[in-house]
């Protein structure tokens, strides 16, 4: 060991930061008149809710991941029994004459799970919407974006279908029609979208929702030709998927 003090710097820095944050919170509680008064005034509850909201946003944007929920979902997972809605939206148990508001229980994955359940309920009556990959062009990019898109849409419980790619637009269009795609995801490199995406859109726009995987520089030109849907790493995944549910009548 060359520098013991230097090696402990990271732990000491974290410890100091935690202590400073804890002391700041302690003083804020004291300003409310103590912990009990802080509870009665809703100060503690507001702080907890603010933390929950920040975490909800991080989960929706996949900055915080739950494997199997908002990242790497099981494409074939099915719910085999009825579920109580209280799992996704806990009841408010605060009594009418209570002095202190009761906090609801919190689970980070709940919003994604509720969204997926909504698709499952719809699928039981109408069939599960198919999201079909339309890979074309650069092999590495189309495979990477198809994988990203499959993972993206499976989070909402859609049936995702991938394939090895197409040599022509007509070949891809035919496959989409044969698979009765509700959503078609164009998967390619940024540079190649301008060359085939408008043609694919024109031939499929009356049959399915057309989505571009990525956020290419040519997006303004593509939007001018009608391509308005894009999925990429900066999306709020939860809100995007809810939007596609609405478009499909779910």
Question: Where are the predicted features?
Answer:
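Peripheral docking tails and interdomain loops at the edges
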Residues: 198-250
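Flexible loop/turn segments at secondary-structure boundaries
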Residues: 11-12, 36-37, 46-47, 138-143, ...
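Short, glycine-/Ser/Thr-/acidic-enriched flexible segments
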Residues: 43-44, 71-89, 136-139, 167, ...
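Long, amphipathic alpha-helical stalk/connector segments used for oligomerization, subunit docking
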Residues: 1-39
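Generic long, charged, amphipathic alpha-helical segments
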Residues: 121-186, 193-204, 211
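Short glycine/threonine-rich loop-to-helix capping motif typified by GTGT followed
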Residues: 10-25, 46-59, 141-147, 175-179
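Intrinsic disorder at enzyme termini
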Residues: 24-129
């Amino acid at each position: 060991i060359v520098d013991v003090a230097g090696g402990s710097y990271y732990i000491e820095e974290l410890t100091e930061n935690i202590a400073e944050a804890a002391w700041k919170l302690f003083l804020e509680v004291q300003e409310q008149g103590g912990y009990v008064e802080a509870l009665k005034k809703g100060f503690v509850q507001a702080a907890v809710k603010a933390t929950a909201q920040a975490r909800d946003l991080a989960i929706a944007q996949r900055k915080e991941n739950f494997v199997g929920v908002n990242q790497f979902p099981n494409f074939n997972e099915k719910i085999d029994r009825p579920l109580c809605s209280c799992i996704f939206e806990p009841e408010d148990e605060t009594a009418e004459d209570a002095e202190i508001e009761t906090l609801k229980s919190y689970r980070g994955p709940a919003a994604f799970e509720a969204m997926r359940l909504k698709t499952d309920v719809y699928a039981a009556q109408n069939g599960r919407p198919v999201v079909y990959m339309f890979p074309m062009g650069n092999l590495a990019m189309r495979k990477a974006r198809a994988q990203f898109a499959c993972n993206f849409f499976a989070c909402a419980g859609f049936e995702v279908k991938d394939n090895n790619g197409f040599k022509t637009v007509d070949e891809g269009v035919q496959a989409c029609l044969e698979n009765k795609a509700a959503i078609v995801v164009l998967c390619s490199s940024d540079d190649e979208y301008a060359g085939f995406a408008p043609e694919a859109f024109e031939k499929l726009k009356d049959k399915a929702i057309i989505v571009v995987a990525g956020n290419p520089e040519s997006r303004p030109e593509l939007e001018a030709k009608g391509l308005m849907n894009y999925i990429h790493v900066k999306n709020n995944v939860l809100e995007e998927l809810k939007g596609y549910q609405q478009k499909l009548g779910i």
